[in-house]
Swiss-Prot record:
Gene3D superfamilies: 2.40.50.580, 3.40.1350.60. This is Sugar fermentation stimulation protein homolog. The gene is sfsA. It comes from Pseudomonas putida (strain ATCC 47054 / DSM 6125 / CFBP 8728 / NCIMB 11950 / KT2440). InterPro entries: SfsA (IPR005224), SfsA_C (IPR040452), SfsA_N (IPR041465). It comes from the Bacteria. One of its GO terms (molecular function) is DNA binding. Belongs to the SfsA family. NCBIfam families: sfsA (TIGR00230).
Amino acid sequence: MRFSPSLEQGRLLRRYKRFLADIELASGEQMTIHCPNTGSMLNCMREGGQVWFSRSNDPKRKLPGTWEISETPQGRLACVNTGRANALVEEALRAGTITELAGFTALKREVAYGEEGSRIDFRLEFEGAPAYVEVKSVTLGYPDTAVAAFPDAVTQRGAKHLRELAKLARQGVRAVQLYCVNLTGIDAVRPAEEIDTAYAQALRAAVADGVEVLAYGTRLDAEGIVIDRRLPVLLTP
Protein backbone atom coordinates (compact mmCIF):
# COMPACT_ATOMS: atom_id res chain seq x y z
CA MET A 1 0.00 0.00 0.00
CA ARG A 2 1.49 3.29 -1.14
CA PHE A 3 0.40 6.64 0.22
CA SER A 4 -0.40 8.92 -2.71
CA PRO A 5 0.40 11.67 -2.22
CA SER A 6 3.03 10.97 0.43
CA LEU A 7 2.11 11.71 4.02
CA GLU A 8 2.74 15.09 5.60
CA GLN A 9 4.55 15.41 8.92
CA GLY A 10 3.84 17.33 12.10
CA ARG A 11 4.31 17.31 15.85
CA LEU A 12 1.59 16.01 18.17
CA LEU A 13 0.21 18.55 20.61
CA ARG A 14 -2.68 16.52 22.03
CA ARG A 15 -5.32 13.90 21.27
CA TYR A 16 -8.79 14.52 22.67
CA LYS A 17 -12.44 13.45 22.35
CA ARG A 18 -11.08 10.17 20.90
CA PHE A 19 -11.37 11.30 17.29
CA LEU A 20 -9.47 14.60 17.31
CA ALA A 21 -5.80 15.54 17.49
CA ASP A 22 -4.04 18.89 17.40
CA ILE A 23 -0.70 19.00 15.63
CA GLU A 24 1.90 21.61 14.72
CA LEU A 25 3.51 21.73 11.29
CA ALA A 26 7.13 22.66 10.64
CA SER A 27 5.92 26.11 9.57
CA GLY A 28 4.47 26.68 13.03
CA GLU A 29 0.90 26.38 11.76
CA GLN A 30 -1.40 24.41 14.05
CA MET A 31 -4.21 22.25 12.73
CA THR A 32 -6.75 19.73 13.97
CA ILE A 33 -6.81 16.35 12.25
CA HIS A 34 -9.10 13.32 12.46
CA CYS A 35 -7.94 10.42 14.64
CA PRO A 36 -9.32 7.20 13.07
CA ASN A 37 -8.73 5.02 16.13
CA THR A 38 -11.30 4.14 18.81
CA GLY A 39 -8.79 2.44 21.11
CA SER A 40 -6.77 3.91 23.93
CA MET A 41 -3.67 4.15 21.68
CA LEU A 42 -1.69 3.11 24.74
CA ASN A 43 2.08 3.43 24.21
CA CYS A 44 1.73 4.39 20.55
CA MET A 45 1.78 8.17 20.82
CA ARG A 46 3.44 10.90 22.84
CA GLU A 47 2.86 14.61 23.03
CA GLY A 48 5.68 16.32 21.18
CA GLY A 49 6.33 13.22 19.09
CA GLN A 50 6.22 13.09 15.31
CA VAL A 51 3.04 12.22 13.45
CA TRP A 52 2.30 11.70 9.77
CA PHE A 53 -1.06 12.44 8.22
CA SER A 54 -2.85 12.19 4.89
CA ARG A 55 -4.72 15.15 3.45
CA SER A 56 -8.01 14.97 1.56
CA ASN A 57 -9.05 17.48 -1.08
CA ASP A 58 -12.74 16.74 -0.51
CA PRO A 59 -14.34 20.14 0.21
CA LYS A 60 -17.15 18.43 2.15
CA ARG A 61 -14.78 17.18 4.82
CA LYS A 62 -14.69 19.27 7.98
CA LEU A 63 -11.18 18.02 8.79
CA PRO A 64 -9.05 17.39 5.70
CA GLY A 65 -6.24 15.69 7.64
CA THR A 66 -6.29 12.07 8.86
CA TRP A 67 -3.70 10.78 11.33
CA GLU A 68 -1.96 7.77 9.79
CA ILE A 69 1.35 7.09 11.59
CA SER A 70 2.63 7.97 15.03
CA GLU A 71 6.04 7.97 16.67
CA THR A 72 5.75 5.91 19.86
CA PRO A 73 7.43 6.67 23.20
CA GLN A 74 9.81 3.79 22.40
CA GLY A 75 10.83 5.37 19.09
CA ARG A 76 8.87 2.91 16.96
CA LEU A 77 6.41 3.79 14.23
CA ALA A 78 2.76 2.75 14.57
CA CYS A 79 0.02 2.97 11.97
CA VAL A 80 -2.82 4.32 14.12
CA ASN A 81 -5.40 4.35 11.32
CA THR A 82 -7.14 1.06 12.15
CA GLY A 83 -9.01 1.20 8.85
CA ARG A 84 -5.77 0.44 7.03
CA ALA A 85 -5.49 -3.08 8.46
CA ASN A 86 -8.24 -4.66 6.35
CA ALA A 87 -6.95 -3.04 3.17
CA LEU A 88 -3.43 -4.27 3.95
CA VAL A 89 -4.65 -7.79 4.63
CA GLU A 90 -6.72 -7.87 1.43
CA GLU A 91 -3.69 -6.71 -0.54
CA ALA A 92 -1.56 -9.43 1.07
CA LEU A 93 -4.23 -12.10 0.51
CA ARG A 94 -4.50 -11.30 -3.18
CA ALA A 95 -0.69 -11.26 -3.51
CA GLY A 96 -0.37 -14.65 -1.78
CA THR A 97 1.81 -13.19 0.98
CA ILE A 98 -0.29 -14.84 3.69
CA THR A 99 0.65 -18.34 2.63
CA GLU A 100 -1.69 -20.09 5.07
CA LEU A 101 -4.63 -18.55 3.18
CA ALA A 102 -3.28 -18.78 -0.37
CA GLY A 103 -5.21 -20.47 -3.15
CA PHE A 104 -8.72 -19.17 -2.53
CA THR A 105 -11.09 -18.86 -5.49
CA ALA A 106 -13.24 -15.99 -4.21
CA LEU A 107 -13.05 -13.24 -1.58
CA LYS A 108 -15.97 -11.42 0.01
CA ARG A 109 -15.76 -8.58 2.54
CA GLU A 110 -17.99 -7.76 5.51
CA VAL A 111 -20.18 -10.87 5.33
CA ALA A 112 -22.91 -11.27 7.96
CA TYR A 113 -22.59 -14.47 10.01
CA GLY A 114 -23.04 -16.02 13.43
CA GLU A 115 -25.67 -15.78 16.13
CA GLU A 116 -24.64 -12.45 17.68
CA GLY A 117 -25.10 -10.14 14.70
CA SER A 118 -21.46 -10.16 13.58
CA ARG A 119 -19.87 -9.37 10.24
CA ILE A 120 -16.70 -11.19 9.27
CA ASP A 121 -13.93 -9.15 7.66
CA PHE A 122 -13.23 -11.71 4.93
CA ARG A 123 -14.92 -14.86 3.72
CA LEU A 124 -12.65 -16.85 1.43
CA GLU A 125 -13.77 -19.74 -0.77
CA PHE A 126 -11.49 -22.74 -1.20
CA GLU A 127 -13.02 -25.17 -3.72
CA GLY A 128 -16.42 -24.82 -2.10
CA ALA A 129 -15.19 -24.81 1.50
CA PRO A 130 -15.22 -21.35 3.11
CA ALA A 131 -12.75 -19.81 5.51
CA TYR A 132 -13.81 -16.95 7.79
CA VAL A 133 -11.08 -14.44 8.62
CA GLU A 134 -11.34 -11.80 11.35
CA VAL A 135 -8.68 -9.04 11.29
CA LYS A 136 -7.39 -7.03 14.25
CA SER A 137 -4.90 -4.16 14.05
CA VAL A 138 -2.12 -4.32 16.67
CA THR A 139 -0.24 -1.18 17.76
CA LEU A 140 0.49 -1.78 21.45
CA GLY A 141 4.16 -2.20 22.29
CA TYR A 142 6.11 -1.99 25.53
CA PRO A 143 9.65 -0.80 26.38
CA ASP A 144 12.45 -3.36 26.41
CA THR A 145 10.50 -6.04 24.55
CA ALA A 146 9.81 -6.84 20.91
CA VAL A 147 6.49 -8.53 21.76
CA ALA A 148 3.36 -6.55 20.81
CA ALA A 149 0.02 -7.06 22.56
CA PHE A 150 -3.69 -6.87 21.75
CA PRO A 151 -6.02 -5.25 22.73
CA ASP A 152 -4.98 -1.84 24.07
CA ALA A 153 -8.36 -1.41 25.81
CA VAL A 154 -11.14 -3.73 26.97
CA THR A 155 -12.98 -5.00 23.89
CA GLN A 156 -16.24 -6.85 24.37
CA ARG A 157 -16.70 -6.73 20.60
CA GLY A 158 -13.38 -8.51 20.10
CA ALA A 159 -14.39 -11.25 22.53
CA LYS A 160 -17.71 -11.62 20.69
CA HIS A 161 -15.87 -12.13 17.42
CA LEU A 162 -13.79 -14.88 19.01
CA ARG A 163 -16.93 -16.61 20.29
CA GLU A 164 -18.43 -16.49 16.81
CA LEU A 165 -15.26 -17.91 15.27
CA ALA A 166 -15.18 -20.68 17.87
CA LYS A 167 -18.75 -21.67 17.00
CA LEU A 168 -17.78 -21.96 13.35
CA ALA A 169 -14.72 -24.05 14.20
CA ARG A 170 -16.79 -26.43 16.31
CA GLN A 171 -19.04 -26.93 13.27
CA GLY A 172 -16.04 -27.89 11.16
CA VAL A 173 -15.77 -24.55 9.34
CA ARG A 174 -12.33 -23.01 8.96
CA ALA A 175 -12.11 -19.93 11.21
CA VAL A 176 -9.08 -17.63 11.44
CA GLN A 177 -8.14 -14.78 13.76
CA LEU A 178 -5.50 -12.69 11.99
CA TYR A 179 -3.49 -9.99 13.78
CA CYS A 180 -2.06 -7.30 11.51
CA VAL A 181 0.84 -5.82 13.49
CA ASN A 182 1.16 -2.20 12.38
CA LEU A 183 4.14 -1.47 14.62
CA THR A 184 7.84 -1.51 13.78
CA GLY A 185 10.44 -3.43 15.79
CA ILE A 186 8.16 -6.34 16.70
CA ASP A 187 9.04 -10.06 16.66
CA ALA A 188 5.94 -11.65 18.24
CA VAL A 189 2.38 -10.98 19.47
CA ARG A 190 0.49 -11.94 22.62
CA PRO A 191 -2.93 -11.28 24.16
CA ALA A 192 -2.82 -8.29 26.54
CA GLU A 193 -3.86 -10.20 29.65
CA GLU A 194 -3.05 -7.21 31.85
CA ILE A 195 -5.60 -5.07 29.98
CA ASP A 196 -8.41 -7.48 29.07
CA THR A 197 -8.30 -10.83 30.83
CA ALA A 198 -11.63 -11.88 29.31
CA TYR A 199 -10.30 -11.37 25.79
CA ALA A 200 -7.15 -13.37 26.51
CA GLN A 201 -9.25 -16.21 27.93
CA ALA A 202 -11.60 -16.07 24.94
CA LEU A 203 -8.64 -16.30 22.57
CA ARG A 204 -7.23 -19.39 24.27
CA ALA A 205 -10.71 -20.97 24.36
CA ALA A 206 -11.16 -20.26 20.65
CA VAL A 207 -7.84 -21.92 19.84
CA ALA A 208 -8.90 -24.95 21.88
CA ASP A 209 -12.06 -25.10 19.75
CA GLY A 210 -10.03 -25.12 16.55
CA VAL A 211 -9.72 -21.45 15.57
CA GLU A 212 -6.47 -20.73 13.74
CA VAL A 213 -4.50 -17.73 15.00
CA LEU A 214 -2.11 -15.95 12.66
CA ALA A 215 -0.06 -12.78 13.02
CA TYR A 216 1.74 -10.85 10.31
CA GLY A 217 4.08 -7.90 10.68
CA THR A 218 4.36 -4.86 8.46
CA ARG A 219 7.06 -2.62 7.07
CA LEU A 220 5.90 0.97 7.27
CA ASP A 221 7.07 4.52 6.67
CA ALA A 222 5.68 7.77 5.30
CA GLU A 223 5.70 6.35 1.76
CA GLY A 224 3.64 3.23 2.41
CA ILE A 225 2.91 0.06 4.36
CA VAL A 226 3.25 -3.58 3.36
CA ILE A 227 2.69 -6.88 5.16
CA ASP A 228 6.02 -8.67 4.94
CA ARG A 229 6.46 -11.49 7.49
CA ARG A 230 4.78 -14.07 9.69
CA LEU A 231 5.07 -13.53 13.47
CA PRO A 232 4.57 -16.07 16.27
CA VAL A 233 1.60 -15.69 18.63
CA LEU A 234 2.38 -16.34 22.30
CA LEU A 235 -0.81 -17.59 23.94
CA THR A 236 0.38 -18.39 27.45
CA PRO A 237 0.56 -15.61 30.08
